[in-house]
Amino acid sequence: MDIRAAEISAILKNQIKNFGQDAEVSEVGQVLSVGDGIARVYGLDNVQAGEMVEFPGGIRGMALNLESDNVGVVIFGSDRDIKEGDTVKRTGAIVEVPVGPELLGRVVDALGNPIDGKGPINSAIRSRVDVKAPGIIPRKGVHEPMSTGIKAIDALIPVGRGQRELVIGDRQTGKTAIILDTFLNQKPAHDAGGDDKMFCVYVAIGQKRSTVAQFVKVLEERGALKYSIIIAATASDPAPMQYLAPFAGCTMGEYFRDKGQHALIAYDDLSKQAVAYRQMSLLLRRPPGREAYPGDVFYLHSRLLERAAKLSDERGAGSLTALPVIETQGNDVSAFIPTNVISITDGQIFLETDLFYQGIRPAVNVGLSVSRVGSAAQIKAMKQVAGSIKGELAQYREMAAFAQFGSDLDAATQRLLNRGARLTELLKQPQFSPLKVEEQVVVIFAGVNGYLDKLAVSDVGRFEHGVLSYLRTEGKDILDAIRTEKAISDDVKGKLKAALDTFAKSFA
């Protein structure tokens, strides 16, 4: 065997010369106690609030309570695999999630990990989950419509791009259905490929997995998943994941807002996020306040919803519109969380169980629902026709309450009640059938101009269906004119009246 001393010594000299002296310092701590999704950790002296830490086995956590002798960490995963004495490492990074167009069409958890079995997400950009909302100067007033495709909302409670509109109601009143229809209504804009298309983000908090799966299935079947991102922190996920999911979703939506594009985010629902946050806070021994929620539960929701904004032209004029959902108990909107969120948002859509069971669907209580942005978020054509419907419905509700007692009503009151009943019928709409704005304008125009007054209430839906079919074939120029001009000129008004007269004669 030939031993070459010179060669061996050269290799050794080379290794000694290139020996790396830069040792890696990572700050570690030890688990003192663990339970209920909370770990108390000793050490980690320089950890930041909201920093991601790592437990053995790759389980992540977030440092929330920085106390004098220990750190309270919430665990994003099962605490079964963590035991006393385990080593905890700092990552040096505040909690981040992947963002960008690569997430479109995917279902992810609160940390941005895919849970839909379609492989990894190759997004190069990561953003912090909890960032400061834009200030006053970078913003602009809300002035562009965000069309939901639902007549009752687009006509009476218009939502603009960059607005926060609360959807509030008891369980099983159709809150998620409104969000689903709004998502589906963005499809024509995506198919047309214009700049005004909206990307949709849906955050499911504390829901059943089957419900989320059903939501995704409907989006997929109707071709709406390609422009949507679903963040799911289901009922079986730990409370910290349910707390984090809305912030993660908001960050993903902000990516589009900051690029000068438009995004719509729905939080379904924030009551469950508040419950998850209450659980975490109580386990971290933070002092409880009203209804045992922590003192900063208002700040939890306000800092989240303030991130929805319409940015100024200098910032690219992008927008993020938020549709938070709150579930009430027995129509009690004066509870703690509902009143908080009502005061943060720019209006609310009230859904009522009674209306739902009367067959008025969407079950929107038009009297209690408001949009504080109002007609600034409507096209002129819609303002022209919807202005009078609000007043007529308000008078109708007032009269209907009195009419229960009196049998002999004068002709004017009778006329008002008849018109109101038909307008209420006109605002009904089946699920998964969002209407284009110009079609809504035509239908409401027919309602407020007395074309329904002679019909039986049961025929209103059939009449609406017939009018739209007729105009899509015979009156295409009228619909096109309303869509392009965004207003009803005298010329278009004349044509529309003539078309409605012609159809009304043939309708039987």
UniProtKB/Swiss-Prot annotation:
PROSITE patterns xrefs: ATPASE_ALPHA_BETA
Family per record: Belongs to the ATPase alpha/beta chains family.
Major location (coarse): membrane
Localization (cell): Cell inner membrane
Topology with respect to the bilayer: Peripheral membrane protein
Record InterPro entries: ATP_synth_asu-like_sf, ATP_synth_asu_C, ATP_synth_asu_C_sf, ATP_synth_F1_a_nt-bd_dom, ATP_synth_F1_asu, ATPase_a/bsu_AS, ATPase_F1/V1/A1_a/bsu_N, ATPase_F1/V1/A1_a/bsu_N_sf
Protein name listed in UniProt: ATP synthase subunit alpha
Catalytic activity: ATP + H2O + 4 H(+)(in) = ADP + phosphate + 5 H(+)(out)
UniProt: ATP binding residues: 169-176
Quaternary assembly: F-type ATPases have 2 components, CF(1) - the catalytic core - and CF(0) - the membrane proton channel. CF(1) has five subunits: alpha(3), beta(3), gamma(1), delta(1), epsilon(1). CF(0) has three main subunits: a(1), b(2) and c(9-12). The alpha and beta chains form an alternating ring which encloses part of the gamma chain. CF(1) is attached to CF(0) by a central stalk formed by the gamma and epsilon chains, while a peripheral stalk is formed by the delta and b chains.
Domain of life: Bacteria
GO molecular function: ADP binding; ATP binding; proton-transporting ATP synthase activity, rotational mechanism
Species the sequence originates in: Allorhizobium ampelinum (strain ATCC BAA-846 / DSM 112012 / S4)
Gene3D superfamilies listed in its UniProt record: 2.40.30.20, ATP synthase alpha/beta chain, C-terminal domain, P-loop containing nucleotide triphosphate hydrolases
Entry EC no(s): 7.1.2.2
Sorted UniProt keywords: ATP synthesis, ATP-binding, Cell inner membrane, Cell membrane, CF(1), Hydrogen ion transport, Ion transport, Membrane, Nucleotide-binding, Translocase, Transport
CDD domains on file: ATP-synt_F1_alpha_C (cd18113), ATP-synt_F1_alpha_N (cd18116), F1-ATPase_alpha_CD (cd01132)
Organism placement in taxonomy: Bacteria, Pseudomonadati, Pseudomonadota, Alphaproteobacteria, Hyphomicrobiales
Residues with site note (Required for activity): 369
Record's function text: Produces ATP from ADP in the presence of a proton gradient across the membrane. The alpha chain is a regulatory subunit.
Primary enzyme class: translocase
GO-annotated cellular components: plasma membrane; proton-transporting ATP synthase complex
